[in-house]
Each structure stands twice: as C-alpha cells, then as structure tokens.
Amino acid sequence: MEFSCTGTNNQLAVHRFTETRFTSFKKELLVNLGISDLNDIKNICEDSKIFFPEKRTELLSIKDRKSKQIVFENSLNDDLLKKLHALIYDELSTVVDSVTVENTVTLIMYEKGDYFARHRDFSTVFSKNIICVHLLLYLEQPETGGETVIYIDNNTSVKLKTDHLFDKTIEHESITVESGRKCVALFDVLLEKKLSASTNVIGSIEYLGKKINLYDRENDLQLCYCDMVIERMTEDKEYSLGMISDRSGRCIKSHHNGSIVRYRKEEYGSFDALCIYNMNEVDEIWTGDKKHIIWSTIDKKTGTSFIPIDPVLYEKLKAISSKEHKEYKDLRGFCNSRTEYICCSVSKYYFDLPTKTDLIHEVINSIDYDTKSVGTPDWYTLPIEVKQTILGNMSYEELFNIVRGNIALEEDNEYGCD
C-alpha cells in the first residue's frame, strides 16, 4: 500500500507507491532506452561518483559509494514523460499543485557488497514552495540488504525496497546489498507544494486611501504584480523586470533592472511580448509546461481591468517584493534558429484595487472636489445622496484621477508592443 511521511514544517519527506503503480511504465522505459535485459545495464555502466560542491566536480570515493550507473539525458519521448508525470501527480494531487519531471534518468546497479553511505544531495532550487525529490523505481530488488533508508529526523527513519520518492535534501543512504542485486531508475522531480485552499495575505500597501492586501493565489482577484529575474545562459546576461498584469494577459512594465518606469505607458499585450521586447534576439518565448506564468486562464474578452500608470504604485509594489515568495519557472526561447533554456524566478502578488464605491467614499470624505464643471457650484451644501449620484455617473478612471491627483510622468522615449 502507499503511504506518506512528513518532516520539518509538515513538509512531504517520503512517499511510497504501491508495488504495481509503475509496472507498465518501467517496461516501457526499458524499451525506450533500448534495454532488453537488465544484464545489459552492467555492461554499459561506469563506476558511480560523488559530487563534491567545494570542488564543483564528481569524483570516485569508494568509502562513500560503491555502485555502477549510466545516465540517459533527454531520453524519454513526450508520451512517456507525460505518463510518468500523471502517475506521480495523480497520487500526490492533494498535497502538490504541480509536478515537474526532469527528462534525465539514471540507471544504478548495486551488486553484492555495494552501498551508498549516508548523505544529503545538493539542490540548486531555493524556494519554500518547491520540494526537490528523487524518484526511485525498482527494476530489480535484492534478496537481502540494499534498502534505501531515509532519515526524516533524529528519531525517525524509513527503510524501503519498493518504488518511492523522497526529499533529496534530507539524509538518506543505500545500505549494503548482502545477496542478490539492486537496480533502480532515478529521476529528479520538483514538487510545488499545495498552498491553503484560501488565499494567504503575504503583504500589503497603502494606496488611494485604502489598505490593499497582496495574496499568494489568484482566486477571483483581478490584478497581479510580478517581480522577475530572467537569466539567459547563452549571453551570461541577467534581467530583472517588474510588471502588473490583468486577466486578459495584458502587462504594464513597472521597473526594468530596478529602475522604476516613469513614462506614460509601457504596455504589452502579453507576457510573451514583454519578454521578447526586453530581451535581445529572442524571437519566441514560452513556459516549459505551456501554462501561463501568472494566470490559470486568460480571458481576452472580459479580463481587462484598469491598471494605473503610476510610479508611486510601482515603487510601493517593488518595495514589498521578497525572495521568500520566489518560484522558479521553466522558460524557453527560440533564438538564432534554436531553442534556448532560460532561468527565471518570479514572485507573484495578487490584488484588487479599491472598488468604485471606495473611491466615491474617498472623494466625499477626503477630497475638496470642484463641481463647477458639472454645473453644481456648491459641493459642500449638496446632500450626500446627490454627491453619490454625481460621482456614480463617473467612470472608474475619472474617480481614480480625482483621488490620485496629478501624476508626474516623463515624456515617452520607449514604446510597449502588443
């Protein structure tokens, strides 16, 4: 039967799958790799090495590890990769929002006397919402010994000899094979933890006379502020961008490499357009999972919302952005007739502007509004119901301009694109 164990901060540490869950997949995997007999693996394997972070290289270390392995990179076809993704996600969907499987499989063989000493694996992903795990699929089980032991904490450990995944950053080992042979397929997998079903407030700003809460999930909120760092490996260049997006996918750029945008409008019809326009020579860009980087769905017809062109708002949003809420996204671009992998981290803050009613209330209670232009010279003597009617006939943008007042902007010297 399957079961899960949690560790620090109630985070998933280990999950064991049923013995038959991956049976079909493992058969297809070996066919895909061109392996008809497990004995063939031994003939093409090399001695396993240890990665030493301080030396930034892999070296043989017999005191730490004795086994043989071979690495197959980008070896799974799309259908097989999708099948593996579904097998993992369908079982973990109550605790994770998404699963990313790296298209690299390592086949490892432990013969009698082989082992892998207690250790932690290095992770390059630093995000509190992402768990880096190893998926171990057993192609052959040893008769005795050879279990994988995961040390959840100082007092708890789990010993397994069936298909499972575990947090690679906690201590684990493969104990010595006493008889028989152990052969496993290892995949690196990223699990994005499921947040609370309701939104969580992760910040707030004061704007237009109201406190605006910023949330970690979109739910029914209409706007999102994103702070991104995009690194292009081929050019050794790093870009930081801030933007506000509505549900139509439209984006207003708020800062570029830390400099607040102070022009009249830096608007783009989509996230793709913003990235392409601000990164040289990228002809096309997309996320690895083909999902929108901000919204679950894009609504071009009814998703357009008012987005202020206001450096003061941009400054407030930039100031609250924190690495604590950073997520890594798989971006890919088409440049110079080839696909380029792009490293992207993004912090997302979902919010709504004050409502029209809020702005009307702010005008009535806090603004000395001149009504001569609408033929009502004495604003202060008007009943509140009349004031509400006059202001209610105005558009949201007109009310915004009254409450916000004059916004100092520079002349345009750059233009957004659709």
From Swiss-Prot:
UniProt entry keywords in alphabetical sequence: Early protein
Top-level division of the source organism's lineage: Viruses
Homology family: Belongs to the poxviruses C4/C10 family.
The protein's name in its UniProt record: Uncharacterized protein FPV006/FPV255
Organism name: Fowlpox virus (strain NVSL) (FPV)
High-level lineage: Viruses, Varidnaviria, Bamfordvirae, Nucleocytoviricota, Pokkesviricetes
